[in-house]
Amino acid sequence: MKLEMICTGEEVLAGQIVDTNAAWFANMLMEHGVECQRRITVGDRLEDLVAVFQERSTEADVIVVNGGLGPTSDDLSSEAMALAKGEPLVENKIWRDRLDDWFTRNGRVMAESNLKQALIPESAIMIDNPVGTACGFAVKLNRAWLFFTPGVPFEFKQMIKEQFIPFINERFEIAGDVALRKYLTLGQGESSLADALETIVLPEGITIGYRSSMPHIEIKLFARGKAAISEMDKIEAQIRFLLGTAIVANNKKSLAEEIHALLIDSGKTLSAAESCTGGMIASQLISHAGSSAYLDQGLVTYSNESKVKVLGVKPETLDDHGAVSIATVEEMASGARAILNSDYALATSGIAGPTGGTEDKPVGTVAIALATKSGVYSQMIKLPRRSRDLVRSLSTAVAFDMLRRELLDEAVIVDYGSIKRFQK
């Protein structure tokens, strides 16, 4: 099955919004063993939409069209498809009744423009949208099935999972013997990872892919067929041997998700005292439901005064060593842990840039500490030539990895290929 995607909208084409739907879709389908082979972005111009529908329908088996199903004048997907097919738009009675009911239940008067959302090409199959006012539809043109979806992300994702996957599985039998494993890495560039793994001889049906999502690189091990799946453990063992400490999580979207799971399982508690990361540690954990079970507090102690008054950092420590130092960050972590007697506390203090660096402590210098009930671990890392946001996100990731290793009873401080440390 040859799958393609057409994304519509001037704001997407002009880069005014980031097309997260396309990235999510390609990843979702890959997990089902289907590769999206082409993606095209088209603006809100009727003739361009008609042309691309006609052209791609002769090459692809399935085309997902995203966007252009709203009630406004620049929502043109339905009209363009009808023109491409050479048939009229007709009102779908089921969806018209659904619209009437939706507006009545929500105590609103339906605008005349909303009636447009019940118009679909005459030969189209209506696709339900239980969470929005724009129905989807599927229509056959030339070789391809074109599957039209709303642009609103949560509507799009639900339609893909509940409607599109069953639709293509019924017609193309995509469900089969496929398996996907993901490994989240830290501290190694994509080319370095690829070089390290190039010695692996992959059996037929197994592929290795890479996806950069800073501060991590995700490695995907994909197998198709029973024979290939049976070889995955052996290939995974080679990946782990070659990459060593670079792998920080399995089948997780982020290191924060891994920490969340480990803290839930362990029953341990955590406090955070953040300076340069500015609450990023706490924020990433709080994005996961249930974090209240372990997160005692998240403190942004940005000024020296707050470090002293809130965390109990000694003024002489700041005078002698500075805010960005092993001594200061260790006292920050110890102070944060002591406030609520947490099992662990993470602390960060650094120079995220673009200014503020010195010869001894250039921009990208970050001190990180992990306080436990038995002691404190600390390191000061170098992150030169990174943006302010990347310095903060990398520092957060290193802090999380220190805690992860402590929770797994591993060495807390390890070497990373692209992240250097100051010697204590």
Swiss-Prot record:
SMART domains: MoCF_biosynth. Pfam families: CinA, MoCF_biosynth. It comes from the Bacteria. Belongs to the CinA family. HAMAP family: CinA_B (MF_00226_B). This is CinA-like protein. It comes from Shewanella piezotolerans (strain WP3 / JCM 13877).
